[in-house]
Amino acid sequence: MKVRTKGLLFDMDGVLISSLGSVERSWQTWAESKGLDARETIKTAHGMRAFETVRKLMPDGDHAAELKVVEDLEMEDIADLQVLEGVVSILQLLPQKYWTIVTSATERLARRRLAVAGIPLPARIITADMVANGKPHPEPYRRGAEILGLATEDCLVIEDSTSGAKAGHAAGCKVLATTFSHSIDQLEAADWIVESLGKVKITILHEDQGLVLEFTSLK
């Protein structure tokens, strides 16, 4: 299958990098300190902004203070952070005008993880603390398209979560999902599904005509 687009909007965790170990350990530590169910806390946190997770699980708590506790735990825990398959070769190929990152992490945490991973950082990215509404709301991906100077229908979102795929569609983008964290059935909001970016070939077209992605969709 070949898909043509003018810009790529990458989610971060589960698409470019895996910080799953850090995320789960940090939320488990926080949950246990608050007497919350760790498994349910981790499930709630995936694909949702940390602030929203804290607010949902502790509606009467000091949300800003609790967010800082979780973020500090995640900032310190980077031992097993990994760059995912296919990411390095794709980002080495792409000039930065063609892509940016749209993540549910805060800017502080996103920049920390990307630096540790050695991933080149676009001049501007969209993070949790830059939007009023997190995924699955369309705002994050609308803002990402604005960074690239493109209409949302000219952008392809690359996601690994249900909420992220829904956000991309709600923004008016097509969505390519990877199966890093969710099953094919859970990613029904995506237009196409691949195992990882290692299964995707990208060609840059001449004269600023955009990009062509080639892959075999699992959907």
Task: Describe the function of each predicted region.
Residues 36, 40, 55-89:
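Metal-dependent phosphoesterase signature
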Residues 4, 76-101, 105-111, 115:
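Short, acidic loop-to-helix structural element flanking the phosphoryl-transfer center
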